[in-house]
Amino acid sequence: MAEQKAKVVHGPGPRGMGGPRPKVENPGKLLKRIMAEVFQHYLPHCILVLICIVVSALANVQASLFLQTLIDDYIIPMTQQQDPSFAPLAGALVRVGCIYVVGILAAWLNARIMVNVTQGTLRNLRIQLFTHMESLPIRYFDTHPHGDIMSVYTNDVDTLRQMLSQSIPQLVSSAITIVSVFASMCMLSWQLTIVTMLMVALMLFCSKKITQQSGKFFIAQQRDLGKVNGYIEEMMEGQKVVKVFTHEQKALEGFRELNDKLKDSAKQANSFANIMMPVNAQLGNISYAICALVGAAMAVTGMGGVTLGTVMAFLSLNKSFNMPISQVSMQANSIIMALAGAERIFKMMDEPSETDEGYVTLINAKYDKDDNLVEANERTGIWAWKHPHHDGTTTYHKLEGDITFTDVDFGYVPNKTVLHDINLYGRPGQKIAFVGSTGAGKTTITNLINRFYDIQDGKIRYDGINIHKIRKADLRRSLGIVLQDTHLFTGTVMENIRYGRLEATDEECIAAARLANADGFIKRLPEGYNTMLTGDGANLSQGQRQLLAIARAAVADPPVLILDEATSSIDTRTEALVQRGMDGLMYGRTSFVIAHRLSTVRNADCIVVLEQGRIIERGNHEELIAQKGKYYQLYTGAFELS
């Protein structure tokens, strides 16, 4: 927009993208909220997963304990027999094999279910994010970098995928394994259990120190990743400007700076995270070796009733005990990283939605036999405001397109007014043109009409109704808007025109294109109205894109038009085509027009000259020329329009 916008309060770093705070606040609350999302839709699945985890963990423990029986009751007696029978040993091995098969099947089922739970939860989160994003006010998008918003959908949601599919199930499995293995070790030998627990305490101490250091760097990594995404998005959108000013090297330097910061934060985070597994593995090996030495000594001396089978079973349990301890430490980093992403996700989801206290709605209407307006179920071409009253009655007022500003003051940020005491009116069928230098307040006025922003003081009335009483969706449905920056969606030409009114027929879309003088160039496209547009209509010229935007507004058939510099980027010949189409479109409609070219507003019923948020002149072209004021100076070239 050409007008003064809300000041973006930036955080550190290029392009002003701040990130999460140095530490995740309320990690317990965040984790609880994530799990609530999971349980809301997948509680039975989670119960089944828990059962599978318990079965798998107990199967592993039982297999380790069976080693004692296998060695003491089968293998050692066989070594003392001259002609041992292998049948009992084979039967024992089959039983061990069955235990392992049960554990493997439980683990496989657990993995399959968690894939379904994880992807379903992420799908629901993305839907909630997008649904909420659509309800956010324009102010949010004006004050938040789009690349940072995209990073929430991609990177932050993906960190939750790893946590839900791997980290949390492994933590639960580790907890169950630790409890069951600890009980089994105590049952086998409390002395060896004490030795193991001393080493576990050392492992936990090291893990805590490493996690504390890596946590802050994982959050910084997410922040820096958002900055990189934002910068790439900005450079892609502004690539033509970059090339025109030959700033490719400067753009590359900016990217390198952000990329280096991402590399540093990722390196620091992963340096700590990557040493955790080797450290814990080596401490586990030391624990295993000490238990083997102590256990062997106890078995030889017969201390505590420890046998060779007991030692072997205990060593197997020792491995099973150390592994989940290491996994807990390793998955803690993954959860911290996911919580950093979850904080950004829920921060966006907790942004207040656009408020709407309106209760006056826009309806299709018709006249009854007494010539009174009544609501119609079919499209009649007559629109009316349905105004319910406190006494239970309802009145219908035909939509005329009468818009009035009375003593309006407005500022994008508190204590900084950009519009001062604006008084103007647009009668049905009038063409009101706004002219003035960049930042004068032209686009801001049109933003107030469609309530992208709300005024601080004064009143805006639409057909005599305070626009705060009109439901925003109905208010905007009554307005046809051609924005300063034309945006086309991926799809056919016909689909882009129909976006103005989704129920419009092909014939109505073609008629709108003809009205906007777009039909000629559309027919020359390879597939005509079925030509696919991609990349915001990159295969069209700027003028053709503007013509499609005007056709899109025309098919909506609105009583009020807002044309925000609609022809500022079109060549003179195309402008003449557009102007003829626009004259037909604006006939009988209230129109608010902003243009850089004064030739496009000469036939306006009223020209409003703005300067620093104030109306300094108003009148038609002849009247303003006769005054020889600011408009005269702009028209004669004494001052530039922008």
Tell what function each PLM region has.
Residues M1-N60, I75-V96, N110-M114, T118, ...:
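Membrane-integrated ABC transporters
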Residues G13-P22, Q119, I127-S151, N155-V157, ...:
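Short intracellular "coupling" helices and adjacent cytoplasmic loop segments at the cytosolic face
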Residues P20-G28, C52, A59-I75, I99-H146, ...:
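Juxtamembrane helix-loop junctions of ABC transporter transmembrane domains
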Residues K32, I51, A106, N110, ...:
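Hydrophobic alpha-helical transmembrane segments of ABC transporter permease domains
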Residues Q40-L43, I138-R139, N155-L164, I168, ...:
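An intracellular "coupling" helix at the cytosolic face of ABC transporter transmembrane type-1 domains
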Residues H41, H45-L58, I99, Q166-A220, ...:
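Transmembrane helices of ABC transporter permease
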Residues Q82, A365-S642:
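ABC-type nucleotide-binding domain
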